[in-house]
């Protein structure tokens, strides 16, 4: 059976393909790789560089979860689609209000992935459950910088942490990604694919 794969499109955008071939897009906007029809689309907040749904080929059954559905009346929602479970979690900083932004924990095929969204270090990060992969923004302008993200990585119980959203207006900035220091760091450039393992 084929393994799940993460294709990093650049900026804050990435695509996950499950073992069964289901396709998940997170914060669509940047790069390429939107050719596969979506089964699920996750939007962490409604900034233009995270919610370009027009790039995606929708199917009749495609489900779209946006921040306004994921955080209702102060409660972070859980979604069970059968083949995947999604738990919304806090995401916020001075540029992104707690009320309008979320992160997501994705559970499928024995894996857990943390899609942090646009955020800085939050009090709640230390309380998140163990996870296989965490993707953290490190641009230092609209989100935390690489140093702060390194502190977040130490808070998380993650097997691997991947720095994304590395520079405003750029798909990927390798030099800034290198500034992210964590013993469990994985560097993934825009256009690269990672096989996800339990």
Where are these regions (language model features)?
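Binuclear metal-ion centers of metallo-dependent hydrolases, dominated by the metallo-beta-lactamase
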Residues: 6-7, 72-75, 98, 148-198
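Short, conserved loop/helix-junction motifs that constitute active-site signature segments
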Residues: 34-36, 54-61, 128-129, 152-157
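Acidic/His-rich segments in extracytoplasmic proteins that coordinate ligands and/or metal ions
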Residues: 49-65, 69-72
């Amino acid at each position: 059976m084929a393994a799940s794969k993460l294709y990093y499109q650049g900026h804050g955008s990435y695509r996950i393909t499950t073992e069964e071939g289901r396709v998940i897009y997170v914060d669509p906007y940047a790069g390429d790789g939107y050719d596969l029809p979506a089964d699920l689309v996750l939007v962490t907040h409604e900034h233009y560089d995270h919610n370009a749904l027009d790039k995606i080929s929708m199917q009749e059954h495609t489900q779209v979860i946006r921040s306004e559905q994921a955080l209702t009346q102060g409660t972070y929602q859980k979604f069970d689609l059968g083949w995947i479970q999604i738990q919304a979690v806090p995401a916020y900083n001075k540029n992104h209000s707690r009320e309008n932004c979320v992160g997501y924990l994705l559970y499928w095929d024995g894996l857990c992935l943390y899609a942090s969204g646009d955020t800085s270090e939050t009090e709640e990060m230390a309380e998140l459950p163990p996870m296989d992969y965490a993707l953290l923004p490190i641009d230092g302008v609209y989100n935390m910088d690489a140093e702060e993200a390194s502190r977040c990585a130490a808070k998380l119980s993650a097997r691997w942490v991947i720095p994304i959203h590395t520079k405003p207006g750029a798909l990927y900035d390798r030099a800034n990604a290198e500034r992210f220091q964590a013993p469990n760091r994985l560097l993934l450039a825009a256009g690269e694919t990672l096989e996800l393992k339990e």
